[in-house]
A protein has these predicted regions:
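ABC ATPase NBD coupling module
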Residues: 74-90, 193
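Short coil-to-helix segment of the ABC ATPase nucleotide-binding domain corresponding to the Q-loop/switch region
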Residues: 102-109
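Helix-to-loop junction immediately C-terminal to a conserved catalytic motif
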Residues: 57
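Catalytic Walker B motif of ABC-type/P-loop ATPase nucleotide-binding domains
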Residues: 167-170
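Conserved ABC transporter NBD signature motif
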Residues: 65-73
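Conserved ABC ATPase signature
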Residues: 142-146, 150-152
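A short, proline-enriched helix->beta-strand linker immediately N-terminal to the Walker B motif
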Residues: 161-165
Length: 215
């Protein structure tokens, strides 16, 4: 784990989230993740793990409190500026949500295409990301031809292709067997070793306890 002198990448200050039905997903939460740190969010279903990640990713907004990203409050960021902030993040879900009509290469390239990267740069970055997750030879395959573990690795490649400062993962091993789960966690460790801040929500305590990271 690489940590940048204790500087905080993410900080929650008294964050609460209440939904329209009156349910309090989070109440007065204070939390921080250092630059270059890898940590886990644990807890039972409904404990607010996914909500916390959605607030960081600006998929949802808090009811009260501050969310600091590199010292800047993003809790009330205008919608116009959200895409710029999200480019600093890679987001991975339990279901990778791959597009069935697009090849693996095209799925991974999607964030770069949206951001307006040149064709040559897209090719270089996509192939580097696929090589990192061990799927370069399958760049022309379609998602339905891959196993569940391979599809999750495609999701990870797509999340890191724009070289984010932060990786957020919501139950990334939830549908995988123990061996594949360990492989996915090893990938997160590799990205963390080059300075990426990693925050993973997981209820898999058996797997987490094998790893020496903050809970």
């Amino acid at each position: 784990m690489i940590s940048d002198g204790g500087k905080r990448m993410i900080e929650f200050e008294n964050i609460s989230k209440r939904y329209e039905n009156g349910y309090d997903a989070l109440k007065h939460v204070n939390f921080s993740l250092k630059k270059g740190e890898m940590a886990f969010l644990t807890g039972h279903s409904g404990a607010g793990k996914s909500t916390l990640l959605k607030l960081i990713a600006l998929i949802d907004r808090p009811t009260n409190g501050k969310i600091l990203l590199n010292g800047h409050n993003i809790a009330k960021l205008s919608n116009r500026k959200v895409p710029l902030v999200r480019r600093q993040m890679g987001i991975i879900f339990q279901n990778p949500y791959l597009l069935d009509d697009y090849t693996i290469f095209e799925n991974v390239a999607m964030p770069l295409m949206i951001a307006g990267y040149r064709h040559q740069e897209i090719g270089r970055r996509v192939r580097a990301a696929l090589a990192k997750v061990g799927l370069l030879k399958k760049e022309k395959f379609y998602p339905q031809s891959l196993s569940g573990g391979e599809q999750q690795r495609v999701g990870i490649a797509r999340a890191v292709v724009n070289k984010p400062a932060i990786l957020l993962a919501d139950e990334p091993t939830g549908n995988l067997d123990p061996e594949l789960s360990a492989e996915i966690m090893a990938l997160f460790e590799q990205f963390n070793q080059v300075g990426v801040s990693v925050l993973i929500a997981s209820h898999d305590l058996a797997l987490i306890t094998q790893l020496n990271y903050r809970l």
